[in-house]
A protein has these predicted regions:
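Ligand-binding pockets and gating/stacking loops
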Residues: 1-427
Length: 427
């Protein structure tokens, strides 16, 4: 394969890493890094602004909803849920919460302080109201495995890295296989080679030597970073070779539900020790018209996708993963003239996985669907109490950073989250 073609494919797969250091720094990172064996992180974005009253923060009263009454609200352990049925009875909130409730932590009354899509998405997934912070997946990958070629995989949502790691946007195993086996004419045929193994080894040796010489001659940081990116693009192919041992066939990926399809390469990367976090996304939640039907359609895709994702992750990587689900914001407690619901700052988040205590609800909204503050020490809701503190995305991020073991890292301290000091812990 020609070098230019190789780099084009590497770029397509997101492997032209935006390295914050030059070649020497990248080599030091590679020498220090071991196979990643912490939990795999999945951040699932419900794009457009979901309606928690149709999911995990049910109200059962007019004018907030027209779908059910208060005495119809379901319960799975400590978690109350809206009695919504999807796909003509093929799936329901009851199915989801009965199956996963014992492992699930629900956080209601999360105050995003915005009704703007971009601002809400950034706040939910960076922990800061405003620009400047990386996505949480990028931060965790940047601390735990900054030079891994698939450390942070993204299929949508907020995925800014602030240079802490690379971001990979690919769900095509065929593209990755060409990068993993650059000496094969057909990546699926082990003996179909451009060069003999000895010749390929000599070429690789000369390439490394030339890259070392080019790096030694550079004094400008920008050019040094370029050599670092080139080094990562080339040396990453060895780890991608390992990835291919775990990667599903492209036909399997195509046949999977959308949310699972987005995650399958990341799961293979995790099993190979080169993936840390993945952004996943389901759209269709911006329901300004025909809210009840359109929101239900989007929730059906989300919940069936989450079911498939969690089931697949359980089978592939046991309990060594975390799933966090959130949205831009919530929906209004009243319907508009188009039978839709508009933007509302109060929302919910859900999470399950390693280290997270399940069958638990934190926070609340009141009868008007306004976020209720909590006791900053006990987390008990304190309606109309001036001592109460609001749970914001930043408060949730503080707890997630602690769970991930990155809260004390200098990279995390450089990107502080917003919000009050609330003693939220997830374990």
């Amino acid at each position: 394969m020609q070098r230019r073609r190789f780099l084009q494919l590497a770029s397509l797969a997101g492997l032209s890493v935006v390295a914050p250091v030059g070649l020497d720094g990248v080599k030091r990172l590679r020498a220090q890094e071991q196979r990643y064996d912490g939990p795999m992180w999945f951040f699932v974005h419900a794009g457009g602004g979901w309606d928690p009253t149709m999911l995990c923060d049910p109200k059962g009263v007019e004018p907030i909803n027209r779908n059910y009454k208060a005495d119809q609200i379901g319960r799975a352990g400590a978690i109350a849920y809206a009695p919504i049925v999807y796909n003509e009875g093929a799936y329901s909130n009851q199915t989801f919460f009965t199956k996963f409730g014992p492992r699930l932590c629900v956080i209601n009354g999360v105050e995003t302080m915005t009704n703007n899509h971009d601002t809400g998405t950034v706040h939910t997934w960076s922990g800061r109201l405003g620009d400047g912070n990386p996505a949480l997946g990028a931060l965790i990958a940047g601390v735990k495995a900054p030079s891994k070629p698939l450390g942070f995989v993204s299929a949508g949502g907020f995925d800014k890295t602030e240079g802490l790691t690379s971001v990979t946007r690919v769900d095509n195993v065929d593209v990755i296989s060409r990068i993993a086996y650059p000496n094969r004419n057909d990546p699926n045929k082990e003996a179909d080679l451009f060069h003999t193994p000895d010749t390929a080894a000599r070429i690789a040796k000369f390439q490394r030597e030339r890259l070392d010489a080019a790096s030694a001659a550079q004094t400008l940081p920008a050019l040094g970073a370029v050599t670092g990116r080139l080094f990562l693009s080339r040396t990453g192919s060895n780890e991608l070779d390992l990835l291919m041992q775990y990667a599903p066939k492209q036909d399997e990926i195509r046949a999977a539900p959308d949310l699972l399809r987005q995650a399958m390469i990341a799961v293979a990367g995790y099993r190979a020790g080169i993936s840390v976090a993945a952004n996943l996304s389901v759209g269709g939640f911006d329901t300004h018209g025909n809210h009840d039907q359109n929101q239900a359609n989007a929730l059906a895709r989300l919940l069936t996708g989450l079911d498939a994702l969690i089931t697949y992750a359980d089978a592939q990587i046991a309990n060594n993963f975390v799933v966090v689900v959130g949205s831009d914001f919530g929906r209004t407690p009243v319907y508009n003239q188009q039978n839709g619901k508009d933007h509302w700052s109060a929302t919910s988040m859900m999470m399950l996985g390693k280290g997270i205590r399940g069958d638990r609800v934190i926070g609340a909204t009141d009868e008007k669907q306004l976020s209720v503050g909590v006791d900053p020490a006990t987390l008990a809701p304190l309606p109309n109490d001036r001592k109460a503190k609001k749970i914001t995305p930043g408060v949730v991020h503080r707890a997630l950073r602690q769970l991930a073991g990155v809260d004390q890292d200098e990279k995390a301290r450089y990107y502080p989250v917003s919000g009050d000091d609330v003693a939220l812990t997830l374990s």
